[in-house]
């Protein structure tokens, strides 16, 4: 069998060689091996070793060290500004609160260390000359696109409930599925996610939502994710009979997240959009009514959804910019778009072009998750027309006081008394320009000033 060769960064290779030259065994381990086998560039290169923490510290005493994890066997060594974690082979004792082991026992063999890890694809090690050490079928699961716990999945999730969300995130990131036993154990244990800190839950969900397989993962494992965000549960199976929809609320939500086009969005914008899509219809179940024709209606779900989204995001301790951005989008995601230059300019004044571009992206994804009817195609064309005109007006139009051809000094020179009256007059002039009643030229504005 051909032995895989992983190209290690120079510093990671030097660390391995230094540990081995001192008589210790050492391997790169975990995600760097997984990503290398997938042809991806690893973000971190972690090392496991038989060296005890004090031995590692002594060996690299002339380097900058990070010792915050030394009690649990991890010593960070900083080389050329980049930290490398070197962790002693260990086995975890009994876990408390579904998150942290009571004790950590250092061991001398790699096999014992790999057996404590979460998933088979993360339980592989590598060293030059030895190749990949795979004791749990990680390579097979990589080839088959499977997320599988090492050993008994129920035991792994009982030890650390956050592993449930890590399984979801890896499935979304790699576009894999959970093996049946792992999926069943995750569902059985999902209520224990309520014991995990809000910050940890937020970080895992944030990574999941930004991943290429987010929509498919949400569709498959919504009941598991409801352990982290209980408001999801009523959305699952909540029907939407009528001509607009072909999915229940949850499957529509998953499809919308999967349909998001994040091209052109910066990092913050992409995160805001992912969370807005995730929560945009969260209030549909409590707002649902069914008309005499059997069609479902969800009146008021925009505003109620914004309230629920704010509650959820604050509970998860999301960043303030994300809370405000996502809640703002949820609040108007289903509202009609402005028509006509005056209305579009006023929307630019009120919301700004960045928000409106995000709103268009959310509306596209929302519509793409509807039934492919003539009405939906027409509404998508309306969004496209709005986006094109809004983009043009954002470049060429006047929608802020700063863009007016006159300023406060010009008004005072024209006889307006200094103070609040200057601001009031500027706002009136801006409105006149946005409504097309006055051209945005100095002479026209000063002439209009006399009539205000």
What do the predicted segments below correspond to?
Residues 1-452:
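Catalytic cores of the polymerase beta-like nucleotidyltransferase superfamily
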């Amino acid at each position: 069998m051909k032995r895989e060769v992983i190209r290690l960064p120079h510093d990671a290779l030097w660390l391995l060689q230094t540990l081995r030259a001192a008589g210790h065994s050492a391997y790169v381990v975990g995600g760097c091996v997984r990503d290398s086998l997938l042809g991806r560039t690893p973000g971190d290169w972690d090392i496991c070793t038989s060296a005890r923490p004090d031995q590692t510290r002594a060996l690299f005493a002339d380097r900058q060290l990070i010792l915050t994890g030394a009690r649990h066997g991890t010593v960070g060594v900083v080389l050329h500004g980049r930290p490398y974690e070197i962790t002693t082979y260990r086995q975890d004792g009994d876990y408390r609160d579904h998150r942290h082991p009571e004790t950590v026992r250092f061991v001398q063999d790699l096999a014992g260390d790999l057996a404590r890890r979460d998933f088979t694809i993360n339980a592989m090690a590598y060293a030059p000359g030895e190749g990949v050490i795979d004791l749990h079928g990680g390579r097979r699961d990589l080839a088959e696109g499977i997320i599988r716990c090492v050993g008994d999945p129920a035991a792994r999730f009982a030890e650390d409930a956050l592993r449930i969300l890590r399984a979801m995130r890896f499935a979304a990131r790699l576009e894999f599925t959970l093996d049946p036993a792992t999926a069943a154990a995750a569902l059985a244990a999902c209520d224990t996610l309520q014991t995990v800190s809000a910050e940890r839950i937020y970080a895992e969900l944030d990574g999941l939502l930004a991943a290429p397989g987010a929509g498919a993962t949400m569709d498959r494992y919504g009941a598991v994710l409801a352990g982290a965000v209980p408001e999801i549960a009523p959305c699952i199976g909540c029907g939407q009979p009528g001509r607009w929809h072909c999915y229940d609320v949850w499957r529509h939500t998953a499809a919308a997240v999967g349909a998001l086009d994040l091209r052109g969005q910066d990092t913050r914008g992409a995160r805001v959009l992912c969370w807005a899509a995730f929560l945009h219809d969260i209030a549909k179940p409590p707002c649902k009514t069914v008309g005499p024709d059997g069609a479902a209606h969800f009146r008021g779900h925009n505003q109620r959804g914004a309230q629920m989204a704010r509650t959820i995001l604050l509970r998860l301790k999301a960043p303030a910019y994300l809370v405000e951005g996502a809640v703002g989008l949820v609040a108007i995601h289903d509202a009609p778009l402005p028509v006509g230059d005056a209305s579009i300019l006023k929307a630019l004044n009120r919301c700004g072009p960045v928000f409106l571009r995000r709103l268009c992206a959310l509306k596209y994804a929302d519509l793409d998750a509807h039934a492919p009817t003539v009405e939906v195609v027409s509404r998508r064309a309306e969004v496209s027309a709005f986006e094109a005109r809004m983009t043009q007006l954002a470049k060429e139009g006047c929608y802020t006081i700063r863009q007016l051809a006159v300023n406060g000094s010009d008004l005072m020179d024209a006889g307006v008394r200094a103070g609040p009256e200057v601001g009031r007059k500027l706002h009136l002039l801006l409105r006149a320009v946005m409504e097309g009643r006055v051209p945005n030229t100095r002479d026209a504005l000063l002439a209009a000033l006399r009539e205000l």
